[in-house]
């Protein structure tokens, strides 16, 4: 395939928060100076930024890993570590971002300058100045920085065009685009000449302008991936008006009306919302001898399949070769665009809600399993977050972590599972003895 890349899978890692510091104030004439360790800085976010100058996802073919910087550690004198700069990654307009693991749509990036945080940096760990209490005025406790969010993302690029040209291969879509715009698509008398979307700007005689995309040729079964399949259909999702190009000369030996039905069936099979878009039927190649007779037959069959109260789709006879009927077609297209709103690609329920970084009540705080060597293994998102933020170089921090586990009910749950005094318990690579 050509150098157009419309999907990519990448990994992003936000920066970790900086570690908090344990320090004490030691100055002349300041007795009992107390704790003086500052907090760590926030880790950098990974932020996607829409750049209208980009046209493909090609950059992500060569660079698939994006990692933001971590925050600085806390310092003495109660000074906080510096927060890290966000890592800003440029993406083209029309990029849909999904979580690769769940398939959930995170965001749809369509406006120049639009930003979205795809991975949140961890907060800085607290220094010992934060843990001072009347009972413990000089704590030797600090927190490690919170790990930054890490995830795998699936990117899809759907080109931004107001009007999409659809039709069987070799019905004249590329020729039409080259005539009505300054685009220079590859044109040839064989199927799938167009293997990537071509985009061009149209200016009508009345001065209105809109973007037109000549999309890869569609065949029956495309919605199931046949031919160029869903690569084609992905791009038509963003168009507001569809120009359905029909070869009225039947030069390929197919019936024009059967072509019309087959293409609409594929659009409906892929996504029912594609059929909500207004469609203009473009009867192309009207300069050929058989075309007029075929057009009359087409109109007759079309009318037979609509009841008397339904409005028939507009049909515009044209010739991309001789430019017959083009001005009328473009004016009608511009008029239809003016009264057609944009279509949402995804229901709001499919989009990721505003990020929430607490712990849900239903979410298990921890899980217990047992290894083959009889070691009890603790896991779970909340537990691992507390574990990763514990400074095991300080006894008071370790004791604080033990109290947190007890408060979560870990001791009680281990006892209920049959843990005995002296049994080994493992969290990550850290092991300790269970004390009953």
UniProtKB/Swiss-Prot annotation:
| Binding, GTP | 167-174, 192-196, 214-217, 284-287, 319-321
Q: Which InterPro entries match?
A: G_OBG, GTP-bd, GTP-bd_Obg/CgtA, GTP-bd_prot_GTP1/OBG_C_sf, GTP1-OBG_CS, GTP1_OBG_dom, GTP1_OBG_dom_sf, OBG_GTPase
Residue stretches making up the OBG-type G domain? 161-338
Q: What range(s) does the Obg domain occupy? A: 2-160
Show the GO MF annotations.
GTP binding; GTPase activity; magnesium ion binding
Q: Which domain of life is it from?
A: Bacteria
Q: Where in the cell is it found?
A: Cytoplasm
UniProt: Mg(2+) binding residues = 174, 194
The protein's Enzyme Commission number:
3.6.5.-
Principal subcellular localisation of the protein = cytoplasm
Q: Does the keyword Nucleotide-binding apply?
A: yes
Record's keyword terms, sorted: Cytoplasm, GTP-binding, Hydrolase, Magnesium, Metal-binding, Nucleotide-binding
Every copy of the OCT domain together lies at 358-436
Could you provide one GO biological process annotation from this protein's UniProt record? ribosome biogenesis
**HAMAP family given in the database record:** GTPase_Obg
The protein's job, in short, is: An essential GTPase which binds GTP, GDP and possibly (p)ppGpp with moderate affinity, with high nucleotide exchange rates and a fairly low GTP hydrolysis rate. Plays a role in control of the cell cycle, stress response, ribosome biogenesis and in those bacteria that undergo differentiation, in morphogenesis control.
Designated name of the protein: GTPase Obg
Per the UniProt entry, what species is this protein from, by scientific name?
Answer: Streptococcus pneumoniae (strain CGSP14)
